[in-house]
Regions:
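A conserved active-site-flanking secondary-structure segment within enzyme catalytic domains
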Residues: 348-403
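Catalytic nucleophile serine of serine hydrolases
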Residues: 341
Length: 491
């Protein structure tokens, strides 16, 4: 039988994702064959992994990192349903790694009934291969208006009960206040058949001495029969990307060196895979700013256009903010401009998407014209995780010459160059990156996560993901009840 540990939260952004990641690493270093699972994730941050049939598919970045923390190979069973928001009320539905246009068009209640059994398939395959499943919930498990369709929290818990011993912990962000009420209310609203799974409350992001909470934890246990399993200290920079595409608007300056480079990453409404830029925040002397206005681009050295889930929509937003003129002026004055995937497509001459595969129906929509590219969108999405090879880029990018780097591609547009030097190729030799003067566009994601690139461009060594996993695992082992942790993990 497979053991399951469920990480529920009282709210979104309570700390479920990073806590599940830390628990995966604790399990791994105790010798437990563990795997992460989230039945449904909503995020435009995705990674390319293997599907059960051997092909390539997408999962949310959180489960990708959790798998790395558990020291297992990520696959689509770990996040069988991924919702990628396209507008305020619509999302692309990705099932076992592949976008399903028919499901994307369905009302969510009808869709959920079809998705739940598909998600369970992933859980059961994982349970057959692993001794422990660390399940991450979504939002709160006590949204009683959603309970009939909630296969992410409640359905997963019932699948876990059927698979073997199961327990749940409930994490709450105490820094926001109201955690005692949140925990009690969530416990009270849980379905009767699942309330008994809850074996511990966890207060996250606490400032100061946990004794200041007394007698709150004791009174909460008296009312619920559930102990407070731990109080985790506030840690702003835990080294992992935030779940759900959340990011901090505050600019950061990498410690250990004086200011030497200002980098602005644009933050349009449909930004995707923003987590790939997190390592820049740790480069000594690099000032990183998420930018939504022209004022935030004043005095920067680099302007980065990131990936986008809706390229034409984000291009329209960029123009509405007057950022197109700022980017053009920056490039004309010799400033560096980098476009990644959708950002690269915006830098080109035109976008052609008459069937609306990327969101809006557009025919030869003018791009920014800084690269001689024409992008045509089609129904087939390119999903690929493989090394890429730089040729001989020049100017600000010359340090990248000859580098072979791990990368991944998630895109439905094909870009063709009229001119400009192809400076990046995939492992088959196909061009996937072009440069014109100081403007560089690449189809590949994940380049800034490569230590080799950070050394080449900045002469910097930043803490690795594995270091972040170990640090978080240390914190969890220090602050969670040791006996409960041993019982939950089985080791």
């Amino acid at each position: 039988m497979t053991r399951t540990l469920i990480v529920w939260g009282t709210t979104s952004a309570a700390g479920k994702s990073w806590l599940a990641t830390a628990l995966c690493r604790v399990a791994a270093r105790r010798g437990v064959n563990a795997a992460p699972f989230k039945a449904q994730n909503m995020s435009n941050n995705a990674r390319v992994v293997a599907r059960p049939d051997g092909g390539a598919g997408e999962i949310g970045s959180a489960q990708y990192f959790q798998a790395l923390a558990a020291k297992v190979v990520p696959d689509t069973d770990m996040n069988p349903v991924l919702l990628k928001p396209e507008r305020d009320t619509t999302s692309q539905v990705v099932v076992h790694g592949i976008a399903d246009r028919a499901l994307s068009a369905m009302p969510w209640r009808e869709r959920s009934a079809l998705l739940a059994p598909r998600a369970r398939e992933g859980f059961e395959r994982l349970a057959a291969r692993h001794d422990l499943i660390v399940v991450e919930g979504a939002g709160s498990p006590a949204e009683i208006n959603l309970a009939p369709q909630d296969y992410v929290n409640l359905g997963s818990a019932r699948w876990a009960q059927a698979a073997g011993p199961a327990a749940a912990l409930l994490v709450s962000d105490i820094d926001r206040g109201g955690s005692l009420a949140h925990c009690y209310g969530t416990w009270a609203l849980l379905p009767d058949d699942l309330r008994g799974l809850l074996e511990g409350f966890v207060f996250n992001r606490f400032r100061g001495d946990p004794k200041l909470l007394e007698p709150g934890p004791q009174q909460l246990q008296q009312k619920t029969g559930v102990p407070v399993a731990g109080v985790l200290p506030l840690r702003r920079d835990h080294g992992l990307p935030e779940e759900d595409g959340l990011f901090d608007d505050r600019a950061t300056l990498g410690a250990g060196a004086p200011l030497r480079l200002r980098v602005a990453v644009l933050a349009p409404p449909h930004i995707s895979n923003l987590d790939e830029f997190l390592p820049l925040a740790r480069v000594p002397g690099l000032h990183l700013q998420w930018a939504r206005s022209a004022a935030q681009l004043e005095g920067v050295d680099w302007i980065v256009l990131p990936g986008s889930k809706q390229v034409s929509g984000d291009l329209a937003w960029l123009r509405a903010q007057g950022l197109d003129a700022v980017i053009a002026r920056h490039a004309a004055l010799g400033g560096s401009v980098l476009g990644v995937c959708g950002g690269m497509q915006m830098l080109g001459r035109s976008l052609h998407d008459p069937d609306g595969h990327d969101g809006e129906r557009v025919a030869d929509l003018p791009g920014l014209g800084l690269l001689s590219l024409r992008t045509v969108f089609g129904a087939n999405k390119r999903l690929r995780a493989a090394p890429v090879q730089f040729g001989s880029p020049g100017g600000a990018w010359s340090a990248l010459a000859g580098l072979s780097l791990p990368a991944y591609e998630i895109r439905c547009g094909q870009s063709l160059a009229d001119s400009g030097e192809a400076v990046l190729r995939d492992e088959g030799g196909t061009p996937i990156g072009w440069q014109h003067r100081n403007v560089l566009g690449v189809c590949a994601h994940g380049l800034f996560e490569s230590p080799a690139l950070l050394r080449a461009l900045f002469g910097a060594t930043v803490p690795t993901l594995d270091t972040a996993f170990e640090t978080l695992a240390d914190m969890v082992e220090e602050h969670l009840d040791a006996a409960l942790l041993k019982r939950w993990l089985g080791a």
